[in-house]
Amino acid sequence: PRAEHNLCSPDTAVVENALAFYSDIFRKMEIAGIRSIGGGLYAYWPVDYSREPDKAGDLERSIKNMRRLADIAERHGITLNMEVLNRFEGYLFNDTNEGLAYIRAVDKPNVKLMLDTFHMNIEEDSFTEPILQAGKYLGHIHVGEPNRKPPREGRIPWGEIGKALRQIGYDGPVVMEPFVTMGGQVGKDIRVWRDLSQGATEEDLDRDAEKSLAFLKGMFEA
């Protein structure tokens, strides 16, 4: 969400605008049969670090307003997954410990935790312990290599991650989130400054995705 949809803003007009923004999205999601949404819904992105963050105040406001948002989402049968972001992209919570503290403070059954191997690689000491720690609170997971290439092309221990997911009985979405080409607003916001695809065509990228999917199934279903 952009700054005008910031649930931790001290400006109540911004918060009300955010709630209206999400309410409209939830109505459309329900019509489309989509039951889950995730990301940095608790704040805004990309963060403006030119100003000193008010972490304590923003956390308090975010928790209070997330309870309101969760009630709205619940009426549409939607689960909200709070993504744990690395320190360069967010500040309210950067690891699983902080993320779980937030989830428990909000205390709504449709508010879950979302982990991402890219962010975990920066902030966590382990790839498996955060998954085991999240347990029943884990609602969504993003997967990708440390340089944001598709799974199988890097050094992340996918077999260990798959074992941890099976250990907690996770049966939710596993979504690949590669960013390998420059250009556009997404490329700018993600800071992709070189072509990581080695000049791949759309067809090449599709084949890479298929290979990564087969690889993950082998790692996660073993």
Q: What are these language model-derived features?
A:
Residues 24, 33-35, 93-115, 121-222:
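Histidine-acidic metal/acid-base catalytic patches
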Residues 1, 44-45, 71-75, 137, ...:
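Short, flexible segments with low predicted structural confidence
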Residues 2-3, 41-45, 84-88, 117-119, ...:
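Active-site-proximal loop/turn and secondary-structure-junction residues that shape catalytic pockets
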Residues 7-112, 124, 199, 203-208:
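Active-site acidic/histidine proton-transfer and metal-coordination neighborhood
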Residues 4-8, 184:
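Short active-site-adjacent helix-start/loop capping segments
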